[in-house]
Structure formats: structure tokens, C-alpha cells
Amino acid sequence: MANPLLLDIVSYLVDKGLAVGDGEDCFRDFSPETPDFIVALHEYKGDPVVPFTDLVNRSIQITTRDRNADIARRKALEIYKALEADLETSESLVVHFTEERWGQVHLRQSPFKIKTDAENRVTYGFNIGITTTIE
């Protein structure tokens, strides 16, 4: 069985030098109180399944958080640009997250400020759509 999609995206970020590792500075489906700097991946409701295939349309929000707004924004932009660069070199808009996992990726918008929390940490993020296997 394949890894969960979010774990494969963490592996992609680590391979690109954009994160240290799962549970270290990169988290899946939650944002812990510590550390202050994090990358968090959240999956939410996707679109209907792709007819006549075993593919599904999944929705992911990629967020970054730091006490320094410029650092949070810069990291979100680095991740966005890494995905964008991979898409520009692919004829079919496919990103290979791992050797086993690929996805046709749609960057839904560029990074934007989401919030400032009670600890004065700023969160930036952006949303992507991924057509891939269910797992």
C-alpha cells in the first residue's frame, strides 16, 4: 500500500531541502504549538472522482508559520515556486512527489496571509488541487 498523500508531500519537501522532516518542522493535518516555525499540510474536501479511472481530485492547503512574517511568507513562496518549477518542466502538469507517487497539480493561488495567532506568529499559505490515486 502506498504512503498517505500528505506524507509523500512531506518527503517531496524534504528532498527539495524545504523541510527537515515529518514531525520535526513539517506536520500533517495539525499545527502544533511548538516549534514556532512549521510547515503544515492540511487535506480538505476535494472534487468529485474522475469518471472511468481510479483517480481522485484531492485538495491540500500548504501553510507556513513563523514569528517573523517575512520568513513565513518567504518559505511559503519557496514551496510554491518549487511546485511551479516542476510543473513547468512537465508536459502533463505532473509532479513526482516520490518514486511511487505522482499527481497532476493545480496551483489554485499564490501564497497569502492567513492569520496572526495569539503568540504573534504569522501563517501564510496556499491551496493546491491534486489529481492522483486515492492512496
What are these regions (language model features)?
Residues 85-131:
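Acidic-leaning, charged glycine-interspersed low-complexity segments
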Residues 43-48, 66, 111-113:
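Short, well-ordered turn and helix-capping elements at secondary-structure junctions
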Residues 37-38, 59, 104, 125:
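A residue-level signal for beta-strand positions that form part of recognition/binding surfaces
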Residues 54-72, 79, 121-132:
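Oligomerization/assembly interface segments of phage tail-like spikes and tubes
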Residues 48, 133-135:
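Short, acidic Gly/Pro/Ser/Thr-rich loop/turn segments
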Residues 1-52, 86-100:
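Small/polar-rich, solvent-exposed N-terminal microdomains that initiate assembly or binding
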